[in-house]
Structures are given as C-alpha cells and as structure tokens.
C-alpha cells in the first residue's frame, strides 16, 4: 500500500506541474491575440513581448533560490505547496485587472515568486519516498508535467481565449489552479513520519537554521557543472515555448486554433523521451549520467539548425519533434544527479539554487530571442540562441563526466 501511495504523490505532483505550466504559457498564446496586444500596447514590439516572460522568470528564479531554504526548513513540502497553489491562483486571476504593462509585469513577477519553489518541493518529496537507485523513474514521471503542461496548455489557453476572450481565460485558469491544485496536494502529497520535512522543531533560531540549510546546499559537490546544464536546459525550454506560437502563426501562417495543437506536438514527443531517459538513468551508473547531456545536447542543436534551414513544412515538423525528443531525454538526469550529491536535509534547497539561478539566467533568453528576431526580421532567426544553449549542455556535460569519472577512479585507488 505504501508503495502505491508514494506513487500517488508522484502522479499528483505531475498534474500539479501540468496546471502550473498551462498557467505559465498563457502569455505566449496571448502574444498572438490582437485584443490583448492592443490593451497593453504591445503590438509589433517583440522585445517588450519577451519581457513578459522575462519578469516572470526573474521572480521565479529569485524565489526558487532564496525562498526555498525557508520553506524547506520551516514548513516542509506539503504546507509549502498548499501556500504556493493559493498564491499563484490569486495572481493569475489578478493578471487581466492590471491597467498597464508595468502593472502586468509586476503581477507576472509575483506569479513567478509564487511558483518558484515548486520543483524544489517536488525534489524533496521524491528524495523522501524513494531510495537512491529508484529515483530516475519518479523524477522522470513528475518532470513529464512540464511537457504535458505545454501539450495541454497551448490548446487549452487557445480554446479559452477563442471562446471566452483573453481576460476571462485568466480567471478560468485561476479557478482550475485553485480547485485542482489544492485537491492534489491535500489528498496525495504526504511526508513520511521520519522524513527531513517532518523532523521535530529545532531549538536554534529560525535564521540560523535557514542559513545552515542554505550553506549545506551551496557545498553540494559538482554543483557548478550541474548548474551550467540547468541554465542551458531552461534556456531551451523558455526560449522555445515563448516563441513557438509566434513562429507558427506569423512565419508559417497557422490560425490560432491550429497553432494551439501544432505548438503542443513537439512537447508530446518529449513526454515519451523523458520517461525513457528516466528508465535509462536507473540502469546506468551515476558517473555515466552526464553522457545523456553530451549526446542529447549535440542532437538537439543539430535538429534546431535543421528547423532554421528547412523550408518544407514536413521537414520543419520532423526537426521540431526530434529536437524536443532529444531535449526531453535529458530532463530527469539533473535532479537525479543532484539527489546523488546533495545532503538529504538540503536537497530541496540545492535544487532551488540551480533551478533559481538557472531561471535567472534563462529569463533573458525570450527577450534576447526577441531582439535577434527584431534585427533579422524573422522569428526563426531567434532560434540560434537555442542552438547555443544546447552546445553549452554538450560542453558542460562532457566536463561533468570527466570530473565524475576522475573522482570515481581516485576513490577506487
């Protein structure tokens, strides 16, 4: 029964990530809605359009990095997830009430703050409930929520926007977040009685305990190399999901309804590849895991180059699908490597560090892509930034493999 219950928690976290990502991509879909663009005076301004995702990611990154140690030390993942869901639902509902672009940016930044600890809290749950040689699959399954959220998010927001208008779509998403999100957390996400998330209250002062957790996270071995890979991975995610709708509508002539499903297709493929990546992780030794980044990064970069240089729709679709398959296969390796190295009482904060800093850096990718597009006059030209991100994955993965192999040989000697 306990075996089944811990997997219920993983599935609940998967769907929590699904609704969070559906909530995040609504801005990417809004950028092809003339009424939304006119309301916030964003028409034709690619750089300012990219800023809407950038401010969200800045709030998200700072929260993941700085707020997670407080939540891990003082609340545990169940109560922290409950608070997070309530806040992000309220902020989603408040988004259309913003009377100016500046106010919308503030709301988006606060939304990022409320969602920032989500992946760190998920990592804490899996570390509590699964042994070291079992974490590949639950990490992969829960991470499927990213792709599934994008798969469902693009057509869902497109449908809501087409039938209820852009403003009402925010309110309906907020209601979905609140009702479904709270039900998932309260019914299925439970800490173990002996876990680090439910340990007795420490008599030390609060700030001292939080600082101790934060310091342990910073001292995680191989943290720098894993961080570089996280930056590159998130750069690809946010860059591609932010601009794929505009690429399909503005450059390829799809309608908004067609765009919703076409934008989702590449992320459907990454669902299967993420799970396969998790299965592979449980069958190889930890020091071999970085090879997934080397092979996946090289293959993804080549596929994105294929998207940029192809003119036939069939080849463009093939390269988009292949790129996301190769990118998706890398997904579970990052938290699995971190769980291998981080101290159990600081694993959430360690993931918060790399996820937070990764999002802070990748926050500027949508804006950078918008600037490249503005200078070159084509949406696809901005995809060169995605190629650079995957080349960084390749190089950092190779360096991490070398370091881990050397550490293993020294330990055996």
What are these regions (language model features)?
Residues 142-192:
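Helix-loop-helix hairpin linking two adjacent transmembrane segments in secondary transporters
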Residues 287-334:
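C-terminal transmembrane helical hairpin of 12-TM major facilitator-type secondary transporters
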Residues 73-85, 282-296:
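Cytoplasmic membrane-interface "Motif A"-like loop-to-helix N-cap segments
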Residues 107-147:
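Cytoplasmic helix-loop-helix junction between adjacent transmembrane helices
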Residues 1-2, 193-226:
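Juxtamembrane intracellular "pre-TM" segments in multi-pass secondary transporters
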Residues 62-99:
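Conserved MFS/SLC helix-loop-helix module at the cytosolic interface between two early adjacent transmembrane helices
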Residues 63-76, 275-286, 373:
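Helix-to-loop junctions at the C-terminal end of transmembrane segments
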């Amino acid at each position: 029964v306990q075996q089944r219950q811990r997997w219920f928690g993983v599935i609940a976290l998967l769907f929590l990530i699904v609704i969070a990502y559906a909530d995040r991509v609504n801005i990417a879909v809004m950028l092809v809605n003339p009424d939304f663009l006119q309301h916030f005076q964003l028409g034709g301004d690619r750089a300012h359009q990219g800023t809407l995702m950038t401010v969200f990611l800045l709030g998200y990154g700072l929260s993941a990095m700085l707020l997670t140690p407080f939540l891990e030390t003082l609340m545990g993942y169940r109560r922290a997830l409950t608070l997070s869901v309530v806040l992000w639902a309220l902020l989603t509902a408040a988004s259309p009430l913003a009377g100016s672009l500046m106010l919308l940016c503030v709301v988006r930044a606060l939304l990022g703050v409320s969602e920032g600890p989500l992946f760190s809290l998920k990592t804490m749950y899996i570390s509590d409930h699964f042994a070291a040689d079992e974490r590949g699959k639950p990490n992969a399954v829960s991470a499927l929520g990213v792709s599934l959220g994008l798969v469902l998010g693009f057509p869902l927001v497109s449908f809501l926007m087409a039938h209820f208008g852009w403003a009402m779509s925010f309110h309906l998403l907020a209601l979905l977040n609140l009702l479904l999100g709270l039900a998932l957390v309260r019914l299925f996400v439970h800490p173990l009685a002996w876990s680090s998330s439910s340990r007795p209250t420490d008599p030390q002062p609060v700030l001292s305990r939080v600082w101790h957790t934060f310091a342990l996270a910073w001292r995680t071995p191989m943290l720098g190399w894993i961080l570089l890979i996280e930056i590159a991975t998130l750069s690809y995610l946010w860059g591609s999901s932010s601009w794929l709708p505009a690429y399909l509508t503005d450059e390829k002539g799809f309608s908004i309804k067609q765009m919703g499903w076409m934008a989702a297709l590449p992320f459907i493929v990454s669902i299967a590849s993420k799970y396969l990546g998790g299965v592979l992780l449980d069958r190889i030794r930890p020091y071999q895991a970085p090879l997934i980044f080397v092979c996946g990064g090289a293959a993804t970069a080549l596929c994105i180059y294929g998207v940029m240089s192809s003119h036939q729709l069939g080849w463009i679709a093939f390269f988009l699908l292949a790129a996301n398959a190769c990118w998706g296969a890398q997904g579970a390796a990052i938290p699995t490597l971190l769980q291998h190295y981080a101290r159990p009482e600081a694993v959430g904060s360690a993931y918060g560090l790399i996820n937070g800093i990764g999002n802070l850096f990748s926050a500027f990718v949508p804006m950078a892509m918008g600037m490249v597009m503005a200078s070159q006059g084509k949406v696809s030209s901005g995809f060169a930034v995605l190629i650079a991100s995957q080349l960084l994955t390749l190089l950092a993965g190779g360096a991490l493999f070398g370091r881990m192999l050397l550490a293993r040989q020294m330990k055996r000697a």
